[in-house]
Curated annotation (Swiss-Prot):
InterPro entries: Adeno_VII. It comes from Canine adenovirus serotype 2 (strain Toronto A 26-61). The record marks 23-24 as: Cleavage. This is Pre-histone-like nucleoprotein. Cleaved near the N-terminus by the viral protease during virion maturation to form the mature protein. Induction: Expressed in the late phase of the viral replicative cycle. The gene is L2.
Length: 134
């Protein structure tokens, strides 16, 4: 159950994730923020669920995207040291978040367990091959 705090007088919003109404579930012109997350009480439930039906931003046109990538690459190659440090830190943080996400989600944990089983199986096959060759 999500407990929401309304900024005014509790009109237009319900309590609970499946009982929200009045634009609280989706962004709109009348409700510019995702109300369920924005006005959640600090002592309310906090899930790690991903929001469904979230609108993506408009995709960049290929020319702009190519210019952006070229600029980042240029800074990474011969930009000022501070800018290079920022880019390197961003890469490390992104890699950390990727590794962490695998541990947090059930699907990620299952994927890691499957990968570990595959590696063990490969190691056993290699061991058998070496034993038969001798």
């Amino acid at each position: 159950m999500a407990i929401l705090i309304s900024p005014t007088n509790n009109t237009g919003w319900g309590l609970g994730t499946h009982k929200l109404f009045g634009g609280a579930k989706q962004k709109s012109d009348q409700h510019p923020v995702y109300v369920q997350a924005h006005y959640r009480a600090s002592w309310g439930s906090k899930g790690r669920r991903r929001r469904q039906g979230r609108a993506r931003g408009a995709p960049l046109d290929p020319k702009t995207e190519a210019e952006m990538v070229a600029t980042i690459d240029e800074v990474a190659r011969n930009g000022p040291p501070a800018a290079r440090l920022v880019l390197e830190a961003a890469r490390r943080v992104g890699a950390y978040n990727l590794r962490r996400a695998r541990k947090l989600t059930p699907a990620g944990r299952a994927m890691m367990a499957m990968r570990a089983r595959q590696m063990v199986k490969q190691a056993k096959k290699r061991k058998r091959r070496v034993r038969f060759r001798q």
